[in-house]
Amino acid sequence: AWEKSLPQITKLTKSPLILGRGIQTNNLRNNIFNDLKNQKLNVNSANLQFDCCYEDISRVKNIISNNNNDSVIAAGGGKVLDSGKYIAESLNIPCITVPLSASTCAGWTALSNIYTKDGQFIKDVALRSCPKILVYDHKFIQTAPSRTLASGIADALAKWYESSITSSKIDDGLVQQAIQISRVLRDQLLIDGGKAFKGQFENNPSWQNTVEACGLTAGLVGGIGGEKCRTAAAHAIHNAITQIITPNKFLHGEIVGVGLLLQLRLEEMKNNNKLADQSIKQLFVLMKELNLPTTIGQLGINVFENNNLEKIADFTCRDKSEIHFLPFEINKRDIIEVISNFEQQKIKT
């Protein structure tokens, strides 16, 4: 896919800046840099120092302005891709995304999540358009640690459980189609996720199905449904946990997965969802198979110390939180109760 994309890239840009982060992807980004140089492009590069944060965004924007770059090529994980999209839009130049793992669908979503430089979630920003080019090359994805695939599976699974409860009654054909895509996506991941995580890359349809589901199909849900296909408690709890978790120790989807289990428990407790417990047990089996955390404690946080439980509840229930997209009322007491019970019990499967 990368080699085939070069003619399209050279039509779009003559002086790109390659944006990345982390030593793990240095070699890949150097290869990308050299390939573009061989196309007679005037290429520069810059590395993020933190997450998708205003400090990094401002610094990279200055680099682009000083170099007169005419595009951003964001090559990396979700926060690199989000940074590239945000920077490109703010400078009114095109963005090209090159995901280097299957941990996220950020490669083509018109959205950037903004964090502090210490990894605390601030807000999400809706962008005017999707990236101009998305290059999803299986050879790049294969170089990523298997942990990133597990994280991507957890994040993609949340699409169904969040959008179906927040948007199922919206009388809009595109929204309903997006919800059904998320249902098929969930089913695909439940079937193939474990096989993809444990299997080989070559001659493994489950691996291909899974990485494309996480990196491509998951992006269709928001792309078709738009802002009406809402996130809900899984991401609201993720955002709250980032306020107190050790920075950069856990991946986005690893935290979202815990939030998803808690959302289902909330549905059972507050909305009398009879199927929620069965869904938890089904997800729990897959998450254990993927070596994903299933409690906040496994994220390195004791919720019963340092007012952590209250901090999570406060941020989860703040004004304009995604938690309020649920079709039933949730308050801080509910969050405290469900997390307390969940952390103390052992899920029986």
Q: How would you name each of these model-derived features?
A:
Residues 1-71, 296:
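ATP/NTP phosphate-donor binding region
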Residues 171-289:
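Active-site segments that bind and position negatively charged phosphate/pyrophosphate groups
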Residues 64-87, 91-102:
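A short, small-residue-rich loop immediately preceding and capping a beta-strand
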Residues 273-349:
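C-terminal charged capping/lid subdomain of soluble metabolic enzymes
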Residues 89-181:
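A glycine/threonine-rich phosphate-anchoring loop and its flanking beta-alpha core
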Residues 2-5, 25-29, 79-85, 104-108, ...:
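Short glycine/serine/threonine-rich phosphate/pyrophosphate-binding segments
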Residues 1, 20-22, 77, 98-101, ...:
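Fold-independent oxyanion-binding glycine-rich loops
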